[in-house]
């Protein structure tokens, strides 16, 4: 009898953990967190575990007025549409912040799966972030220390920043078939930066015509573990004096990059490590 009660209790627990997850639609192309049907509203009100889809008909772009904080496990499917700040390359806020840069001890791990969309980010050099003084970290997506990002079929364009105009990863990231093009930075990592202790996995990704004035025209890896498989690096550039790593730059103890079947063409730097 006790075993039967235990099984029933377990079943109820499992059911309760997923019962409120939903499939939700974004139906409006602009608006803030207080307006039903917008992306900020749907994310803020979605139960954990929900799948959110952009459903905007023939319209091509969803514009957000401020950074969307991801504080629960979610999947967002862009359905081939674009998610943009109000003024790409100009607006001083990110698109997504996943978890927190300084979470409390024992904070819950927050996971975002993001797929099938183009992301137009802003100008991170003027970005305001009240949670961390590292405001210049990423003009498009910041993955906090208790955050993880799984990205599939994403395109990152237009953004500029200090560190990593596309993604600043302080938590683990896994990207498949993603494209970073035309992004620019003034510190390390024109498109992407993986921070200390992070594991980054990149499969079939393309880094094209990204620039930086310090180190890592496309990617900077700082004390992180990284795996690049079937990726393409082309036309990435470091322009500053005494700068290194036209495509990938490794810094700090423990930084590593395993590179398998990747292609490097026409990347350049002013000092060491063209590729």
Enumerate the language-model features and the residues they cover.
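Sec-dependent, cleavable N-terminal signal peptides
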Residues: 1-23
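N-terminal, post-signal-peptide segments of secreted/periplasmic proteins
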Residues: 20-145
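Conserved beta-strand/short-helix segments
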Residues: 27, 32, 161, 259, ...
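Extracellular beta-strand solenoid repeats
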Residues: 53, 69, 75-77, 84, ...
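Extracellular beta-strand/beta-solenoid scaffold signature
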Residues: 65, 89-104, 126-143, 160-168, ...
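Right-handed parallel beta-helix
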Residues: 79-82, 108-121, 148-160, 172-184, ...
